[in-house]
């Protein structure tokens, strides 16, 4: 399993989208880990970035559980 993203990366969920905000000093690459065990695609966020990282809770996988760090390439 991948390790959780640092606390400075904040996840917001709505019915339609799951969004991540990078409040860290460094660029991070994260994906959404859903409660059903599925993982979304990786998204790279520079410091201060806010981006959609997955579907919301009405999507195929339901509620997101947490943001996970993606392996660095």
Curated annotation (Swiss-Prot):
Superkingdom of the organism of origin: Bacteria
Keyword Disulfide bond applies: yes
Disulfide bonds: 8-24, 42-70
Keywords, ordered alphabetically: Alpha-amylase inhibitor, Disulfide bond
GO molecular function term, any single one: alpha-amylase inhibitor activity
UniProt entry tagged with the keyword Coiled coil: no
Function: Inhibits mammalian alpha-amylases specifically but has no action on plant and microbial alpha-amylases.
Record's miscellaneous remark: PAIM I inhibits alpha-amylases from pig, dog, cow, horse, but has no activity against human salivary and pancreatic amylases.
Identification of the protein by name: Alpha-amylase inhibitor Paim-1
Natural source organism: Streptomyces olivaceoviridis (Streptomyces corchorusii)
């Amino acid at each position: 399993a991948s390790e959780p993203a640092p606390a400075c990366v904040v996840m917001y969920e709505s019915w339609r989208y799951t969004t991540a905000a990078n409040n860290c000093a460094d660029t991070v690459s994260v994906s959404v880990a859903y409660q059903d065990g599925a993982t979304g695609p990786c998204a790279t966020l520079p410091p201060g970035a806010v981006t959609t990282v997955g579907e919301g809770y009405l999507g195929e996988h339901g509620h997101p559980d947490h943001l996970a760090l993606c392996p660095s390439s």
